[in-house]
Amino acid sequence: MIRALAFSLALVFLASAQGCMFVNIPLTFPPTDYQEVMVQDGNRGEKILLLDIDGFLTSGKRSETPFVGLRDSTVNEVADRLAKAKDDRHIKAVVLRINSPGGGVTASDLLHNEVRKFKEETGLPVYASLLDMGTSGAYFVATSADEIYVHPTTVTGSIGVVSMFPQFEDLGHKIGVYVEVLKSGDNKDITGGFRNMTDSQREILQGMIDSLYERFLAAVLAGRPGLEADTLREIADGRIYTAEQSVEKGLTDGVMYLTDVLDHVREDIGAPDGRVIMYRRTSERSYDSVYASSDVRPTAELPRTPSASGTTINLLNVDLQSLWPDQRPVFYYVWLP
């Protein structure tokens, strides 16, 4: 594949030098089926699945973004991997390797539900290991695990909901721009931003945020039965916690490096020589560590752009519209540092 890519790029530069032809070389490849990769050796029997949940948590259809090409949503990726794990009788436990600030409320909720269903259908234990961060929606997902462990430098917590609604009415008055909105009811454009919110409209949105916050608390209480509801409300004011603080507050079970978590899981399931596997989509990358990424993102496309003088080859075509998904969530379980 690398040789073919080098040859294709050579053709691009030759064509560009001649200025007489258009060349369009797509370098965005559709995802392939998942393949099993061993990241820690062991016996040929019991397996522990190491499953990544990283970055901003998303749901919905596959999207194409600049520089990285096609990418599935977090929910699709996790659901696909869990479905594959269900069919493997040698898998004895799952470790969620989480490194995320959170994301959309629905994405967080769907991920939580996927893990919960997997546990119910398979009877297998699930552990969560938080790395750099496991905040807000990422912590929401972690509560679906049987045990939660944090790296010594992990940032976690940030339990709560956030939503932002820019208001442009005052700015429009200053620059002489007015947007006429025709609507069927006073609250139809409540989040439109072209007119300032009224107090009653803020109450409507705050009520929705409060409801989603209660859902977050319920998930934590279900996953952390040792926590009292009153205690949780005191600590769930949106603040973040260090690893040690999260253990003291009862949000997590201990401070462990990922390798120590895996050893702990082996002991729990009675498989001291159990091997650790991941699922990935391509065969281009070697996996020699439990800290290696489980996915390789395809590269972006090399499009063509005609010009009046001949042929122009754009090696990087950045579509700003693709930086935002088609359907953005309104409410977030996310930490905004």
Kindly give the residue locations of the regions a language model identified.
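N-terminal organellar transit peptides
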Residues: 2-9, 13-134, 145-151, 162-337
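Short gly/pro/ser/thr-enriched loop/turn and capping motifs at secondary-structure boundaries
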Residues: 135-136, 155-159
